[in-house]
Amino acid sequence: MQLEIKVALNFIISYLYNKLPRRRADLFGEELERLLKKKYEGHWYPEKPLKGSGFRCVHIGEMVDPVVELAAKRSGLAVEDVRANVPEELSVWIDPFEVSYQIGEKGAVKVLYLDDSEGCGAPELDKEIKSSFNPDAQVFVPIGSQDSSLSNSPSPSFGQSPSPTFIPRSAQPITFTTASFAATKFGSTKMKKGGGAASGGGVASSGAGGQQPPQQPRMARSPTNSLLKHKSLSLSMHSLNFITANPAPQSQLSPNAKEFVYNGGGSPSLFFDAADGQGSGTPGPFGGSGAGTCNSSSFDMAQVFGGGANSLFLEKTPFVEGLSYNLNTMQYPSQQFQPVVLAN
């Protein structure tokens, strides 16, 4: 009796899944099983299977079986919801060794379960059972022969576990081979667009061995930073009023300022007005020869940056560090500076 009730309940509950709350549908099945077992006590005749068949029939339609109404009430479902989600005029006969159903008053009677001990008519019933399978009922699997045991059946046992009883069949774990997993998106070995060439080159270079990756090009020094340095240098020179007539010897030249070349070239002095005199044609103390002299109004750059006893600044290497520009060709920002005239 327990097996036949399970088959009938799984068929009915399969229509409620995905339409009503799953937990409520499970509770409805548990309550209906309990009530049917109690109802069939004393009305189950294995020796005469057809005896009391009308009494054991479960009908859901315009007239709903009182057992179904009570099970819906106890599980928190409305009878109208149960009736609206099952086929119209559904009748299920639960008899010893056989479970069948009918949809509609004039519908054909189809077999859900038949325990044929002698084995006659089993192949024909298999086709009938498959054709009567509910496609929306992924949980329900009809039982076609006696060889199907309870352990293999997806029908749960009510009352044995507090968890939901109508559990869908568990999906088989998906296994991958190395080749099949590599073909998936997660295991794809293809390079992304834009980085394939670089990545391929890196792999090739690592495979060849001994080849160093190409160095990144150095960033060019910003001319703005250099102009700012020149600006600070010129302003600091304009503010000086320390002038000496004796040029400093070659040995007192700062090693960091050897690249700094001052070319007078007969042009007006950078730091003095034309009234103070023109610079001589000979190179200044920063020239390549290092032996030239200046007039009385010349500006002794080596004395300032050299580090002698009369030097105003002992060490000012940050002003001239890294400079390799000619003062005559030096380009200043667009802002115009007024020349400063130093009085004798």
Swiss-Prot record:
Protein name, UniProt field: Protein Tob2
InterPro entries: Anti_prolifrtn, BTG-like_sf, PAM2_motif, Tob1/2
Tissue expression remark: Ubiquitous.
UniProt biased composition (Low complexity): 145-164, 211-225
Protein source organism: Homo sapiens (Human)
UniProt similarity note: Belongs to the BTG family.
Name of encoding gene: TOB2
Gene Ontology cellular component list: cytoplasm; cytosol; nucleus
Single GO term (MF): nuclear vitamin D receptor binding
Cited function: Anti-proliferative protein inhibits cell cycle progression from the G0/G1 to S phases.
